[in-house]
Each structure stands twice: as C-alpha cells, then as structure tokens.
Regions:
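Transmembrane alpha-helix interface/packing and boundary motifs in multi-pass membrane proteins
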Residues: 83-92, 242-257, 261
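Hydrophobic alpha-helical transmembrane segments of ABC transporter permease domains
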Residues: 119-139
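Short helix-loop-helix connector
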Residues: 67-68, 99, 106-109, 228-229, ...
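Membrane-interface alpha-helices at helix entry/exit sites of multi-pass transporters
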Residues: 74-78, 92, 96-97, 107-123, ...
Length: 309
C-alpha cells in the first residue's frame, strides 16, 4: 500500500473514532472537566512521563549491549527522543523506528544490526507490557463482571503471549520452514532475543526496566485522573492502562489517537467512570505524551541535515 494512503487512512481512523466518541458524550462536560484540572497534578504527571524517556534510554542501552553495541547515553537518548517525536508528533510515513534505525546506522552499524537494535527494544518493551497485563488478570475478574469483556481480554493476552513465544523460538522451527522469507526475518531477532534473556544479568535488568516503564504510565494516568477529580482505585488503573497501551500498539491510527480514547472510555466505564471524564482523561494523556515528545523535535532539527529524505 502506498505510504501516503496508509497515513491518510490512519488519520481517518483517528479522527473518525474521536468524532464518534465526542458525539456520544456531552462535549461541554468534557470541556468543563478539562477547565477545572489541577495544574499541579498535571505537572507531576508530565515530570514522570519525561523521566520515563530517560529510563527507556537506559533499557535500550542494555538491549544494544546484547548485540555488543556500545553507544554512549547521550547519543542513545538523542536517537530515542528523535524517534519518539516522529511517533507522537508527526503524522508521516517516516516512523520513529525508521529514524532510530537510521541514526544507529549513522553510528557505523550495518543496516541489519541497526534494524535489529530497534526491533529488540520494541520486543522487550512488549514483553514487559504483556508481563504486566498477565499479572493484572486477577483484577479483571475482580473488577469486571462482563463475560464478553473478560473473554476478549483473555483472548488478546493469550494471543500476544503466543506471538512473543513464537518470535523467541522462531529459529527452532523445523528446517523446511527456514526457506520462508517471513520466517527468516525473525531468525536473528529470535537468536539475539533469547541470548539476551539467558544472560541473567542483562535479561533481568531489561525485564525490570520494561515493567517499570509501563508502571510509570499507570502512575502518571492515576495522577492525571486525580487532577481531573476522577476517583478510581489504583487496581483499576493497573488493569486498564496496560490494556490501553497494548491496544495502541495496533498500527491503525496516528500515535494511538482514537484507539486510546475508545479503550479508556469502555474500560473505565466498567469501573463506573462517566464517558466524559474518561474521554477527558484520555485526551489529556495523549496531549502530555505529545508534549514529552517535543524535545525530540529539537534534537531532530539539530540533526536534520543528516535525516533521510
């Protein structure tokens, strides 16, 4: 599919979902909730989300070490933040992962190693997320009575878990599968990823950092909710936010806009939160993530003479 058409479709999906949700709620109610927000709480959440970027940089350094790639912290941070800017702020066909891979290659790595370095970081981010989702499943049965919702979450969690296992053990498939181009593409990812896990020191640190990164998202949204006057037990956030993040991974919208709002309205609805409040919280969350990504635009601008066309 033409990249411009793909971007256009994502924009349509995001705008369509947000428009649909706004039409289902009292828009003035959303505005009033946002107008009465406690700015101090929002600043706290913004600080936490910014710290999250620095922690994510540390994880990426450990992931790169699994490939014997030694990149100093400053360069790693600049590359990651540039990628974050493109993921969050730029509705373009040049995604953040492409930017990260490009700048890794500019550090003297081969295209294959650069690509693997980015995919490995994505992979371990997903491992930490799925671990958190699976750990919070008991809360699903405690807080949600809807059997269809329960079944849907279990199906998604099981499906993603099996997909991750497949990726980590792709190279162990029978030899007659190795000629398939799609399978071969996962071989290096499988081998390096498994080696990284087997290295107890590196593997444990990466897993802990990955879980911590997602917990920061949970805590940040809790703080935002408090700033909006939304009262939900911590367990509700621990259940909903990882699921929201998991659904945002599906590349059907711009930076998860629309998808995030839909999942948060439905998810928090099960916990008794009004649609207007849940939608206001989701919009605020998206805006703060956008603000956090903006420094990456400054970094990219300084490097723009080296950016791919």
């Amino acid at each position: 599919m033409n990249k411009k058409i793909a971007v256009l479709l994502k924009v349509i999906v995001s705008l369509g979902l947000i428009t649909f949700l706004i039409n289902q709620v009292d828009f003035k109610g959303i505005v009033n909730i946002l107008k009465n927000v406690d700015i101090t709480m929002i600043v706290y959440a913004l600080i936490l989300l910014t710290i999250q970027v620095f922690i994510a940089t540390t994880r990426w350094q450990f992931v790169l070490k699994c490939q014997k790639i030694m990149l100093d912290y400053k360069n790693t941070l600049q590359i990651l933040w540039s990628g974050l800017f493109f993921n969050q702020a730029m509705p373009s066909s040049v995604g953040g992962d492409v930017i990260r891979g490009y700048y890794l290659k500019k550090q003297g790595m081969t295209l294959g190693r650069a690509t693997l370095g980015v995919l490995m970081d994505r992979l371990f981010g997903m491992v930490g997320l799925v671990f958190l989702v699976l750990a919070s499943l008991p809360l699903l049965f405690e807080l949600v009575d809807d059997s269809i919702a329960r079944s849907g979450v279990l199906f998604i969690a099981l499906g993603i878990s099996l997909a991750l296992l497949f990726i980590f053990f792709t190279d162990k498939l029978p030899g007659n599968f190795s000629h398939l181009k799609v399978i071969r593409g996962f071989y290096s990812l499988s081998q390096v990823g498994r080696r990284c896990i087997v290295d107890h020191y590196n593997g444990l640190i990466i897993l802990v950092i990955s879980i911590l990164i997602h917990l920061i998202s949970v805590i940040s949204v809790m703080i935002m909710a408090a700033g909006l006057g939304i009262n939900v037990e911590w367990s509700g956030f621990l259940l909903i936010i990882p699921l929201v993040t998991l659904m945002m991974v599906v590349p059907i919208s711009i930076a998860g806009w629309g998808v995030r709002e839909g999942v948060m309205v439905v998810g928090f609805g099960y916990l008794g939160v009004a649609p207007e409040a849940a939608l206001a919280l989701s919009i605020l969350y998206g805006l703060l993530m956008l603000v956090v990504a903006l420094p990456g635009g400054v970094v990219w601008t300084l490097k723009r003479n080296h950016t791919p066309n």
